[in-house]
Amino acid sequence: MQRKVALIFGGRSLEKEISIITAMQVLKNIDKSKFKVEPVYVDDGNFYVGDVDDIKQFTPFNPSLHEKAYLINGEFFKFKRGKLVKVFKPDVAFLCCHGGEGENGTLQGIMEFNGIAYTSCGVLASACCMDKVFSKSVFSSLLLNVLPYETVMKADFEKDRQGAVEWLKAVLDYPIIVKP
C-alpha cells in the first residue's frame, strides 16, 4: 500500500520560487511505487491543492486559479458545491518550504498540531536555528567551535549603515559572512 505524502512548498518567503524547484526534485526522485504524492502549495497563510503532474502550475501563483484547501484534524479538505469534501489524509508531510515559516518552526508546529509526521527538525530546533544570534550563543555555551561573530541589529544598521560597516571591519577579520 502506498503511503500518502503531502508535498508542501511555497510560503511567504522570498525563497518560495526555490521551494517549487525543491518540490519538483522530490517528485522526480521519490519512489512512486511506495508513495502517493499530493502537492500542497502554501501562499499567504493558505493551503492550495493541485495536480501532481503539473507542479509548475503554481508559478507564477494566481490564487483565483486554484482551490483553497483546509487542514482539519490532519486531513486536507476543500469546498465543492458548498460542501466540505475530504481531499486526502497524509501519512507524512515532506516540507519543501525555504525560509520564514517553512524553517522557523511554524509549519512544523502546524503539522504537529494536526498529528502529521513530517520531514524536518522539530519546532524548537527549527525556531532556534532560524535565529542565528541565538544559535551561535547556544553553540558557544556548549563549547562547540564557532567562528568569531558580532551582531548588528537591523534598526541600528538602518540608523548608521556606514558606522556599522566600519565597526565590523574594525572588530572582525575578512572574510566576513553576513546572515540577515
Predicted features along the sequence, with ranges:
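ATP-binding N-terminal substructure of ATP-dependent carboxylate-amine bond-forming enzymes
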Residues: M1-T119, V123-L124, C128-M130, F134, ...
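Glycine-rich phosphate-binding loop of ATP-grasp-fold ATP-dependent ligases
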Residues: S19, V146-T151, P175-P180
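Short, well-ordered coil/turn elements that cap or connect secondary structure elements
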Residues: K32-K34, F113, S141-L144, V171-L172
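Structured adenosyl-cofactor binding patch, chiefly the S-adenosyl-L-methionine
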Residues: V133-L142
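ATP-grasp fold ATP-binding core
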Residues: F139-S140, L168-P180
